[in-house]
């Protein structure tokens, strides 16, 4: 619903930030998107190994809603980055660096999810929203979420 010509607007319009700030904001978003897939795959591999004892491409594809060739391509990328080791006929295993990344990702997710729960968001929505948000918040914001959660409890009780 647009406003008519000649009618004053009551909403305050946010001014554009300077060019450097704008560029930095978009750079951070691009970097977060790049890391998002890596984090999600590494965390899923860790979860599958913990829950079912192995991480198979077919299981990853099913859980991520993608094709097996898509998973295979990403696994090659993760291996080249040093996060996983693929052993033929045995599956996918995390390297120590991959384990570290999976743990960091899991912790970020938990901090965001707990924060949303304290705000009163339902558990199902908090879990789902945290999955997207965890990749796009700075360490400063995570620290603030954690401090707020510790001050106000760990869930909406």
Curated annotation (Swiss-Prot):
Protein's cellular compartments: Cytoplasm
Pfam family, one: Fe_dep_repr_C
Domain notes: It contains an N-terminal DNA-binding domain and a metal-binding domain.
Entry similarity comment: Belongs to the DtxR/MntR family.
Subunit structure comment from the entry: Homodimer.
SMART domains named among the record's database cross-references: HTH_DTXR
The protein's name in its UniProt record: Transcriptional regulator MntR
């Amino acid at each position: 619903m647009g406003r008519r010509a000649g009618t004053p607007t009551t909403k305050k319009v946010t001014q554009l930030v300077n060019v450097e700030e704008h560029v930095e904001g978009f750079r951070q978003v691009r970097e977060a998107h790049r890391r998002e897939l890596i984090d999600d795959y590494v965390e899923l591999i860790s979860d599958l190994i913990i829950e079912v004892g192995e991480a198979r491409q077919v299981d990853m594809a099913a859980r991520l809603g993608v094709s097996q060739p898509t998973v295979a391509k990403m696994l090659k990328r993760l291996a080249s980055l040093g996060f996983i080791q693929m052993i033929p006929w045995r599956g996918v295993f995390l390297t120590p660096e991959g384990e570290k990344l999976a743990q960091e990702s899991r912790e970020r997710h938990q901090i965001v999810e707990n924060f949303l729960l304290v705000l009163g968001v339902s558990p199902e929505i908090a879990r789902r929203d945290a999955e997207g948000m965890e990749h796009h918040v700075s360490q400063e914001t995570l620290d603030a979420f954690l401090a707020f959660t510790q001050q106000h409890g760990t869930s909406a009780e």
